Amino acid sequence: MAGLVPVPVSSAAATTSAPLAPVVLPKTSESEQLLKIRHSMSHVMAMAVQKLFPNAQVTIGPWTETGFYYDFDNPEPFTEDDLKAIKKEMGKIIGRKLPLERIEVSRDEAETRIKAQNEPYKLEILERLQEPITLYTLGDQWWDLCAGPHVENTKELHPKAFELESVAGAYWRGDETKAQLQRIYGTAWETPEQLAEHKRRKVEALRRDHRRLGKDLELFSIEDEAGAGLVFWHPRGARMRLLIEDFWRQAHFEGGYELLYTPHVADISLWKTSGHLDFYAESMFGPMQVDEREYQLKPMNCPFHVLTYASKLRSYRELPIRWAELGTVYRYERPGVMHGLMRVRGFTQDDAHVFCLPDQISDEILRILDLTERILSTFDFNHYEINLSTRPEKSIGSEAVWELATKGLTEALERKGWNFKIDEGGGAFYGPKIDLKIEDAIGRMWQCSTIQLDFNLPERFGLDYVAADGSKQQPIMIHRAIFGSLERFFGIMTENYAGDFPFWLAPEQIRLLPVTDDVQPYAEQVLNQLKTAGIRATIDQSGDRLGKIIRTGEQMKIPVLAVIGAKEAEQNAISLRSRRDGDLGVTSVDALLKAAQRANAERQPGLGLNP
């Protein structure tokens, strides 16, 4: 699939400084009516496109979590003016109050209909469809192969509650060797008020875009000369990453984990044993020849932890074993899907694996849930959406083991007191899992943490332990990631904070602003005191006027700006301006040191000083 190529669409955008309106935006996955509205709106759009552009051929057009899209094969690129015309035509179609009717047809009848319209993409879709074959008509002039569901009549679609948002390139079937299509994205809601709120949030999302903030705040970059999807951490971003990693390590040591460091490459035979070459080869970088052996970059850390476990004979008395690693992995991502820090080719997973006894599952899962909550809440993620995925039709492992594992996950979630949904049959073939999504400041949900039981790798590698009766038994293996990808989590976190990082996490916590050269020696004295106390502080050396250096500090989102003039130097004090708390007035250096050290130790968002 090709990357997004936004085409701006005129709309009355709300200012980003205004607070988000208290309008609850439903999700497609939670509202059957909204799903029908969006699915039907995609058909209305396709009908409008084919009326205005008779040579355009339709392919697929599903609903999404926030709207809908349709892929078209059209000789000419769609422009902003085209989108306006399409939207206008859609309004006319809605106003005609056309019925949407489901019709069941034979394969031959469907093929006859498609050939009459000369729609080769539909013929290819038809080849893959299982009977019964259904199509939906829109009035008596337009139809498409579709399983539904849809609204009964276009009068259920509000003419002022939809928008066409952008055009992107997309390959047919997501295959770069096939035809390149044009994907028109739209959004549709039940009311105009919901649409207005959606637009407001989109503007806010642009303000928070981690790619822009990463550049403006000098945190990271992706350099074309090095290659796509490879992250360069700049000093300010690297400082933040170190703080995150140090906290992560501390939390894991306190949670009973030991740390591992494992290689970045392995002999290709390891990936054969693990099954990655059978099931994951397309996402792996190709092999490299070294000393007549083939090696490949690791796409996952799991097999390395398995080998570490297998390096010696284990006893049931050792279990549970908890190992964690911040391990860099490498995965091939197509050019069109890479996106800032969210989708990259080299990234760090906060992987952990727990090897335990069957009767330890519930307790170990609960420990993981507690640790997950501790870590995520430290970064102000406190609202979660949790799914428990159970055994699919095709799976490995006995019914008894699956039942025991699923029961352990369920019990742990219930003991934790968290609400969760059950995705029947949604687990991996090798074990049930818990997926946790986090909600950010503007209501978006992000897939983050995963807890996955694995019956596959222990079997493939022949893992065992000596049980109390002297027999050898296979341990239960739990995969677990809290951040998922450290890079991706950093991007989500940056957007959640809009670059206004809490004091403890900010790469530069305090910037000293000497008003004149005469107070420079005093400013340097204060700087030394701050640095000695472990505070990340700098002095503005630009020589610009006070107003400009304050604006520069605000643009860099420095949590605390400390103005130093002759009065402050005489009083052994400083004047503080906090991004969170405003003007804090004149404060002694000693009070600042104590407040800053306390904020760092307790990982607080601000200094805690009163104006």
UniProtKB/Swiss-Prot annotation:
EC number: 6.1.1.3
Compartments where located: Cytoplasm
InterPro entries, per database record: aa-tRNA-synt_IIb, aa-tRNA-synth_II, aa-tRNA-synth_II/BPL/LPL, Anticodon-bd, Anticodon-bd_dom_sf, Thr-tRNA-ligase_IIa, Thr/Ala-tRNA-synth_IIc_edit, ThrRS_anticodon
GO cellular component assignments: cytoplasm
Keyword Ligase on entry: yes
PROSITE patterns: AA_TRNA_LIGASE_II (PS50862)
Enzyme class: ligase
Record-level Gene Ontology MF annotations: ATP binding; metal ion binding; threonine-tRNA ligase activity; tRNA binding
Residues reported in the UniProt entry to bind Zn(2+): 302, 353, 479
Region of interest called Catalytic, as start-end residue ranges on this chain: 209-502
Catalytic activity, as annotated: tRNA(Thr) + L-threonine + ATP = L-threonyl-tRNA(Thr) + AMP + diphosphate + H(+)
Key words of the record: Aminoacyl-tRNA synthetase, ATP-binding, Cytoplasm, Ligase, Metal-binding, Nucleotide-binding, Protein biosynthesis, RNA-binding, tRNA-binding, Zinc
Function: Catalyzes the attachment of threonine to tRNA(Thr) in a two-step reaction: L-threonine is first activated by ATP to form Thr-AMP and then transferred to the acceptor end of tRNA(Thr). Also edits incorrectly charged L-seryl-tRNA(Thr).
Name of the protein this chain belongs to: Threonine--tRNA ligase
Organism this protein belongs to: Synechococcus sp. (strain CC9902)
